[in-house]
Amino acid sequence: MRIFNRSTLIEFWNKHPDAEAPLRLWFSMVEHASWAGPGDVRIMFGAADFLRDNRVVFDIKGNTYRLIAQIKYGPLYLVYIRFVGTHAEYDRIDASTI
């Protein structure tokens, strides 16, 4: 998958150093994936929540952090990082429109 907005992850882990290793792992796993549809995401990330408009919420570091990505499945294989934040920050946003 081709991932856009990696800088969002870097900015976040600079503020929350304990998030760096889990976010790097997420990035590496997604970068090497080839998701044809939501089922492929579910196989890799069983706790992911699926929203409208191909948005997916990923739990990072045991649900301490949340990451929202919008996915263009194959043949494009694109992932747009829309949000990364603490659980409290996530609770204050509309995950389906961010």
Predicted segments — roles?
Residues M1-T64, K72-Y77, H87-I98:
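Basic, Lys/Arg-enriched alpha-helical interface segments
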